[in-house]
Curated annotation (Swiss-Prot):
Assembly and oligomerization: Monomer.
Reactions that this protein is recorded to catalyse: shikimate + ATP = 3-phosphoshikimate + ADP + H(+)
Classification via HAMAP family: Shikimate_kinase (MF_00109)
GO biological process: amino acid biosynthetic process; aromatic amino acid family biosynthetic process; chorismate biosynthetic process
Signal peptide as annotated in the record: none
Cofactor annotation comment: Binds 1 Mg(2+) ion per subunit.
Compartments where located: Cytoplasm
The protein's annotated pathway: Metabolic intermediate biosynthesis; chorismate biosynthesis; chorismate from D-erythrose 4-phosphate and phosphoenolpyruvate: step 5/7
Gene giving rise to this polypeptide: aroK
Protein name according to UniProt: Shikimate kinase
Primary residence: cytoplasm
Cellular component, GO annotation: cytosol
Amino acid sequence: MRGTWSMSVPSDGRNVVLTGFMGTGKSTVGKLLARRLGYRFSDLDALIVERAGISINEIFERYGEQRFRELETEAIRSLGGVSGRVVATGGGAVIAPRNRVLLREAGLVVNLTASLEVILSRLKGDRERPLLKSNNTPEALAALMTARENAYADADLRIDTAGKSVEDVVTEIATFVREHQ
């Protein structure tokens, strides 16, 4: 594993942190939202991969989920003192209470939601997500969603992305951000 945690060039705007279960649209929405707000986009999982020098799947295979979660916390800590970013977190980033505190300190937390059926249709054929390799039944995913619900609820804004265009979700978040800066 290599690298250091750094997020350069802070701007004047407050960060927007997107949380939610896999398949809710965090990365897709985040990229467009960053452009709309004139912010930079950061994907927490991409920061972890860059720092570790190996893929998330490899981190899980070689070191296990616990080590991945430790790297995730380090990446979240790197958000401190940085502003003007839209950050897409991994689906499990909010599991640890300390991460939720760090994310709230980093900026406005927006939780994206969708029903299990919508998520399953969005993730159909996706084999890159480590948790889908072992917990890929609808029942297992439903249990995981339920287990994380209280952590996801710890947000400044919650948006159900089902049946909405990416543009509509971005507009809703951008309006909220402007009202809360």
